[in-house]
Amino acid sequence: MKIAWGSEVEEKLREMLADTPASYRKYLDPDVRACAELHAHRMGKSEVDEDAMIRGFITTIPRHLRDGIHEVLGVHNIDLQYYMPVFDEANPLDHNHTHVS
């Protein structure tokens, strides 16, 4: 599934990944994009918006590393309270831990 990305959302993702080491970013970027597109699809959206992108960003990061995401989201003025439930979600690309709905 390929869902369109708005230019503002693309830029926001680049900004959020900017502090990630390049060696990790090259793997993280495509996974975040795939997760964001999946979240957008599940929400019935035809384009990845900021909400779907942030959900994809959070769920792509392994759970044991998600504490560091709070700082990244805070720097980019993203409402942490709104996204707190997302921190408990599994990575939708990790088929070993997801259930078919």
PLM regions and their residue ranges:
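Non-catalytic accessory segments flanking P-loop/AAA+ NTPase cores
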Residues: 1-101
